[in-house]
Amino acid sequence: AALLAVAMVCAMAIPAWAAPATNGSITVKNTVDGKTYKIYKILDLETNGTGDDASSYTAFKYKATTKWKSFVDSSTYLEPDADGYVTWKAATENAADIEAFSKAAMKFAANLASDATQVADNSGSVTFTGLELGYYLITSDVDTSSKALCMLSTTKPSATVQEKNGAPTVEKKVEYASGSWGEGNDGNVGDTVNF
């Protein structure tokens, strides 16, 4: 009875709290039916901030995965510290360098097995679930230059990426003398032609 009482007192002293997310998901929207989508985990989430800094991207600490360690160690854009925690090099935190980093990562990924692969159906999206938290590269075979980077953390364990695939279509029309629009028109030198 005394042991039960001690256990009850200890249990009452433990505050209720929600455990942080340990798994995440990545959804790719605007997918093309029959095309292959792959994800590669570049960095593992090792620790994260607490309190007021928990929602800041600087609160999270990442280390290179085993497959990506050589890429990260030789990267122009990332810098591992003595403990292996990775940060962006200060001079490379701009859109152009992040784009260049993702291109270099995509080239490196060509020689690796992906962490997950899905073939899109006609639903217009694919979702990768049960992912360990970290920093991911997403590629597709819609366009060989198609890639995206996303971070899954304890405060944002899910990410949605909108794929930009294909070139925009342009419909060309020319105005007829009658004011209607069509595919062609006759004109003389000096005539005004609206198109």
Predicted segments with their positions:
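Solvent-exposed loop/turn and edge beta-strand elements of beta-rich ligand-binding domains
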Residues: 1-195
